[in-house]
């Protein structure tokens, strides 16, 4: 019991010190401690079979937890590396994905900038999936039909005003139904960097989304050419120098 009390005191002391030095890191640390306790509390109940199978190259949002020094930490997007995931498998190997920053103007050997913009993949996904006849947009569809009927009876100014309002409502509804994916698109607007030196095997319980096939991010995958480069960098810079491998042996 004394050891537990000492541990709690150390935690409180560290948390207070962190709060005084860096409020952002303090909030992240505090949130992670809550999440970690929840993960451990539900550890025996977690069942990966309720999650969909994840495909190689697929993009997911993961809580990496509180790391040390330069370890990737806290919620981040990542790319799935498993070639053959199974629903019963509770582990997944991923490589972190981060937004391009000024420091990435000169890439390290283990870094790769995604060639086909992820923002394009995401916006294409939202655009292609939009269907005015979807039940989510029933009210909006009915209002557009009604406006079309009364259009001839009102002046152009009033028609334009009501039409613009419906368009605004439509845009807001599309955003609300695809918030995760559109926020991700905005985050990656300047480019996306893969950090192959931060490859990590995680519990699937750390996946924030997508946890269902119906999630808008579920079937978003990096381009095959980008995946090939990522695989090459993983082998060349972490496993072995491919220039020194004698494949004739």
Identify the residue ranges that each predicted region occupies.
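Short, surface-exposed secondary-structure edge patches
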Residues: 48-53, 69, 83, 185
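A residue-level detector for short acidic-glycine micro-motifs
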Residues: 80-82, 96, 198
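Loop/turn positions that initiate beta-strands
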Residues: 57-59
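Short beta-strand-centered aromatic/proline hotspots
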Residues: 73-84
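Short, conserved beta-turn/loop elements at beta-strand boundaries and strand-helix junctions
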Residues: 83-89, 100-101, 201
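Short aromatic-glycine-enriched beta-strand elements
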Residues: 76, 89-95
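C-terminal terminal-subdomain/extension
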Residues: 1-34, 43-44, 52-55, 105-249
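Short, surface-exposed secondary-structure boundary micro-motifs
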Residues: 64-65
């Amino acid at each position: 019991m004394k050891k537990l009390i000492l541990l709690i005191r150390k935690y409180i002391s560290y948390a207070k010190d962190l709060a005084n030095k860096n409020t952002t890191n303090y909030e992240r640390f505090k949130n992670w401690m809550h999440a970690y306790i929840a993960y451990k509390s539900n550890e025996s109940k977690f069942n990966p079979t309720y999650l969909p199978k994840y495909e190689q190259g697929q993009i997911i949002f993961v809580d990496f937890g509180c790391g040390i020094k330069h370890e990737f930490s806290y919620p981040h997007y990542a790319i799935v590396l498993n070639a053959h995931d199974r629903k019963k498998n509770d582990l997944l190997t991923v490589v972190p994905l981060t937004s391009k920053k000024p420091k990435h103007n000169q890439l390290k050997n283990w870094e790769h900038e995604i060639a086909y913009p992820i923002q394009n993949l995401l916006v294409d996904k939202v655009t292609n999936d939009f269907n005015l006849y979807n039940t989510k947009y029933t009210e909006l569809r009915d209002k557009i039909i009604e406006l079309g009927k009364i259009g001839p009876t009102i002046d152009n100014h009033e028609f334009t005003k009501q039409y613009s309002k419906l368009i605004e409502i439509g845009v807001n509804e599309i955003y609300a139904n695809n918030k995760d994916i559109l926020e991700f698109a905005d985050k990656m607007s300047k480019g996306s960097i893969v950090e192959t030196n931060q490859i990590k095997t995680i519990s699937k319980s750390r996946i924030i989304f997508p946890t269902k096939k119906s999630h808008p991010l579920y079937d978003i995958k990096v381009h095959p050419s980008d995946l090939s480069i990522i695989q090459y960098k993983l082998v060349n810079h972490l496993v072995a120098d491919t220039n020194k491998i004698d494949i004739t042996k």
